[in-house]
Amino acid sequence: SLLSIVLLLSVQLIAQSVPSPKSHFGFNIGDNYKLTTFTATEAYLKKVEASSNKVKLVTIGKTEEGRNHYMMVVSSPENIKQLQKYKSISQKLARAEGLSDEDAKQLADDGKAVVWIDGGLHATEVVGIHQWIETMYQIITRQDEETKNILKNTIILFVHANPDGQELVSNWYMRNTDTLKRSTAALPRLYQKYIGHDNNRDFFMMNMSESKNMSRQQYIEWMPQILYNHHQTGPAGTVVAGPPYRDPFNYVYSPLLITSLDAMGAAMSSRLNAEQKPGYTMKGGSVYSTWWNGGLRTTAYYHNIVGILTEIIGSPTPMNIPLVPQRLIPNSGLPFPIAPQKWYFKNSIDYSISLNYAVLNYAAR
């Protein structure tokens, strides 16, 4: 019918009107030897907000160097119109004050799963903020049924974890016109004004403004049910380390928190395997656990938030996956080993998008 054609065209126009990363930054996210600054990212976020009814750009505070600290809320247009309602439901469920089991079940039915996805906390781990930009763009513009279902049933909090660090590291890397000399090494100063890499040790005391900004969203404003904290790098001979984490787990947590984390890990590793993306290691295949409890992800466990950490390889300067003989034999910690090979930034971006989609697909069900 004519109406169907008009609706289809309008959907296509909406997708086309959201600027692609390449149209804004001048290169595709994941291109070799290319990083983007926070200044350019901030301008991109504003363009996306102006062109899409699936987003709400929120300034959650200022950074220590005085930049705006952003969170992009992404969901269906219908949900975006009712964010306060869904935030209130998430708060009530998290605090559980005066709720009967029946009340809680009704709220869970009425609400939407709230999922936090961040990027860039450790600014030299440059996959983080770049996968964040590309995932956001794809979630907003893709028209497949999975994406539509995710937007309908979840509210995604895309949180920039370190604007100051992105500006410093990207400018430092891109300063050389000779691409072969580009490197994030030997930064002239800390990539968080006062504590640098230890910005992920600040979430139990919140001395830094960025930690306060993010913790306010985590524990007062939104209380996400799932929190995905992106890091680098993966163990040698693999691509990415993620949940389930190694034993022993922190036994003060609810068993349901641990099994939910393990289920999330199963969804993530299975998706990569189904997409023929080998190299996901878990359990005893990495050193990561649930025991360090002052970080962005691990502090969340004390609030019964399913906190996910992945550590992935990758750099805009192409690299090699080395030969590690003990990593070539499949086992429960590495069911699908990866052979030694050349590795590109785009590979890591693609893996990260798959992992984000696995988490969001799980949350939407």
Stretches found by the model and what they are:
Residues 1-20:
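Bacterial Sec-dependent N-terminal signal peptides
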